[in-house]
């Protein structure tokens, strides 16, 4: 009997390689414990641009732009077992990955 109907996991990171590595680790763990996985679904990458002056005093026209991209992935774990939940709790992911977990029941 399933503990919950569905677990939704959203992953965010600045580096897409670490994000994909974490995603495959979660998918492998869920499949190994007998759960069905939908995804990973790549969500749109958000891009933030910051413009600063190059000089502290003069040259207002001389500016520099910095960009940071936030990559996102979505995973749905359908019909998770108790083993799946325990394995996901013990999973050690890299420090640069933000994980949001939501559980949906009946």
Curated annotation (Swiss-Prot):
PROSITE patterns documented for this protein: RIBOSOMAL_S10
Classification via SUPFAM superfamilies: Ribosomal protein S10
UniProt keyword annotations, A-Z: Ribonucleoprotein, Ribosomal protein
UniProt cross-references to InterPro entries, sorted A to Z: Ribosomal_uS10, Ribosomal_uS10_CS, Ribosomal_uS10_dom, Ribosomal_uS10_dom_sf
GO BP annotations, alphabetical order: translation
Function: Involved in the binding of tRNA to the ribosomes.
The name this protein goes by in its record: Small ribosomal subunit protein uS10
Organism the protein comes from: Solibacter usitatus (strain Ellin6076)
Classification of source organism: Bacteria, Pseudomonadati, Acidobacteriota, Terriglobia, Bryobacterales
